[in-house]
A protein has these predicted regions:
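Hydrophobic membrane-insertion alpha-helices, especially the h-region
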Residues: 1-7
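Boundary at the C-terminal end of the N-terminal hydrophobic targeting segment
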Residues: 12-16
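Conserved SGNH/GDSL esterase-like catalytic core that processes O-acyl groups on lipids
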Residues: 28-32, 38-149, 155, 159, ...
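Short hydrophobic segments within beta-strands
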Residues: 34-35, 189
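Helix C-cap/helix->beta junction micro-motif
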Residues: 60, 180-181, 216
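Catalytic His-Asp segment of secreted/periplasmic serine-dependent ester chemistry enzymes
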Residues: 83, 191-271
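Aromatic/hydrophobic pocket-lining residues that form the small-molecule binding cavity
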Residues: 98, 163-170, 206, 252
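Active-site segments of SGNH/GDSL-like serine hydrolases
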Residues: 123-127, 171-206
């Protein structure tokens, strides 16, 4: 599997990277992952086998692969969200949001603790769907058309008012990434299927993320459609998860390989 992914990437063209995407890619590509618990499971260094990112890192050519993911994270902000670079509570909270992972990444790069990434992957959305009571305005904007009708959010590093819907939060965070990492390829992963919420709710969440991503010319990977975790199967008996939501080692390995090949094709220029 590694050989096939590497072969695909060797043929890639036009990718935002400090070197041509060739046989030296393994030594030059720095990858950063943002996300929630299914990415957090792999550890910051992407070595724990219950996380998809560990198997992704084993299957995908890179120089470094670092995760800033936190368990319980959402895209969606709240009225009490503030910039916080240290909180790590392992559950949903006002400051456990992708925005703060973006801020941690920016700070790490400024402090020379993190190499400027050539690829950023953001895999989130499960908790936005699961804990809607904690994010009551998450689905107040249903699509990119409604988002365009809303006032544009400016992009200071410390906004006075955070966007409160899922759509606007995705837009804001991605624009912030694009501002600070203009040469970096950004790919969004929608949430996996889960027994915690209906397939329709996960699809709705994925649709919003996908539409916003496409308005920003970002690639979007629909994990709910291509990955191995299927709600119907997990409701019968846990197969690729240990609780219906979080991957076991088998599920993480399957997903990591699927995602490595999918990303490789995207970087090559395929769909």
């Amino acid at each position: 599997m590694l050989v096939s992914v590497f072969a695909i990437l060797n043929k890639a063209h036009g990718m935002a990277t400090s070197k041509t995407c060739n046989e030296n890619l393994r030594d030059s590509m720095h990858i950063v992952l943002l996300g929630d618990s299914n990415t957090w499971l792999g550890g910051d260094d992407c070595t724990s086998k219950r996380g998809w990112n560990t198997w992704f890192a084993q299957s995908f050519p890179h120089a470094t692969c670092v995760s800033y993911a936190r368990s319980g994270a959402t895209w969606t902000n709240t009225r009490r969200t503030t910039r916080n670079l240290t909180e790590n509570v392992g559950r949903i909270s006002d400051n456990n949001v992708i925005y703060n992972q973006v801020c941690r990444l920016i700070a790490a790069c400024r402090n020379k603790q993190q190499a400027i990434p050539q690829l950023i992957i953001v895999a989130a959305g499960t908790n936005d769907a699961w804990f809607e009571n904690k994010r009551p305005q998450a689905f107040s904007i249903q699509n990119a058309t409604q988002l365009k009708a809303m006032p544009n959010h400016s992009l200071p590093d410390l906004p006075h008012t955070f966007p409160l819907s899922l759509a606007a939060s995705v837009q804001y965070d991605c624009l912030l990434l694009k501002k600070h990492f203009p040469q970096t390829r950004i790919i969004l992963f929608t949430p996996l299927q889960t027994t915690a919420v209906s397939e329709n709710k996960i699809a709705q969440t994925g649709n919003i993320i996908e539409q916003v991503g496409h308005t920003l010319n970002l690639d979007v990977v629909r994990q709910d459609k291509i990955c191995c975790v299927k709600r119907a199967e997990e409701l019968k008996h846990f197969t690729n998860t240990y609780d219906g939501t979080h991957t076991n080692e088998q599920g993480a390995q399957k997903n990591g390989i699927i995602l490595a090949n999918t990303v490789a094709k995207l970087l090559k220029g395929g769909s």
